[in-house]
């Protein structure tokens, strides 16, 4: 006899699991969420590092959780989640030669609605900045921004906010090509090839490649899905603003947990799941590592890696060999570091003389070496070489929220990509960590001369090793598996599982290994709920609310 019983059991308390748990509980189902770690949230994790008084996000940082329907359906702003939108420019690019762009958002995001006024005056201002180093690229960006707003946006949003169509039906990328709304060759191009096809200036080529890498975590010589190509092109001149969660991204998890609890759901931490209990080809519950058994009267939902679902929870013996093979062949190529610096003062960027306000929430500092970035970054990583150039993807938390550092002090986070763990091993990351941080500080001074070691109080380096251990990942990839074209849409993670249901018809997967992939947006959980609503006849709140998605 089971120790506890729920209609729906959720394995893993990451933000996707909390999203889907809240929706299921809203439908009157009894819901239990079981989390291995000491707190729920998964990648929505904030810790006091590197010293008492400083906090840092150890996973998700650059967030747009306001795009998540769960943010509105559960009124998370009433549950402790405050999103901060820095004034002025939300996104900036600083190059070693002194050129820069500080781009304002193209939409005015409002807290309590998904209808955000368009800001054409910001587009005009952003275009002028591009024109300072390429009139042709400025015209191209203007055309792309308008094409995205008028045509592509509807398709991109529909793709993100819905499960992929069943196999055999056309996906939206195919429909776009059929209707001659995009260049068909973009489908097979890698990121670098698109950059060189669309733009002429080294600045815009480099920016596009780094923006794509920041969005989905792949190298310039890897191909991304067409819908993500369109999203990246449409974001070049500002797009939606970037936000930070006041006090840390873990407050997203706190708000979702409150939503779950208010709907009547339960959650348990330090409750590692050993396996899914099966009977007559269906899931009937789970067994915890301590031997406790939990009944699942209707379904089990996994907010975990597909490797765990197949290799551990369901078990290879209970899985068709072809599915086992496909899951084992999934690839996750990109590794990296996320280094949090405690600082005496904020970086003083020399570009501020010509671009006031270029210190932004999301910022790219780049050496203006697009050919190296396109061809050599991944090649050097695969050889186990420490990256020659630091392509800074950084934020300056304390400039916009004083909760992140003691009074009068500051902090910044730097993201840098590196080789995959399967190529070099954890020992390599440990060995080169200090050298990597020294290279960051050295090259930071190309852009901000005050960023010497005298300005650094201390740092905390979080690499793929820590991420892999924290979230039980194959190689510490923040998107779980690569978001390359072969592992997206109807192919993510494998065709048989692409609509969130496994070969066990009441076992579902809702983690970032599913469509639309990694990021703190809650859409994997939301779309998994859509599939479950279809299977079980549950509430379709998007229809009741009059939302398109």
Model-derived segments and their meaning:
Residues 1-8, 26-27, 488-489, 540-549:
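Extreme N-terminal leader/targeting segments of oxidoreductases
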Residues 2-157:
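N-terminal glycine-rich phosphate/pyrophosphate-binding loop and immediately adjacent elements
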Residues 138-170, 394-490:
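Helix-rich C-terminal "cap"/substrate-channel and partner-interaction subdomain
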Residues 149-263, 270, 471-487:
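Active-site/ligand-binding neighborhood in enzyme catalytic cores
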Residues 201, 205-218, 386-395, 449-515:
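A glycine-rich dinucleotide-binding beta-alpha-beta segment and adjacent secondary-structure elements
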Residues 245, 274-405:
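Mid-domain catalytic core of redox enzymes
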Residues 266-267, 271-284, 458-473:
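Beta-rich nucleic-acid/ligand-interaction surfaces
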Residues 510-533:
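A conserved FAD-binding loop/helix module that cradles the flavin
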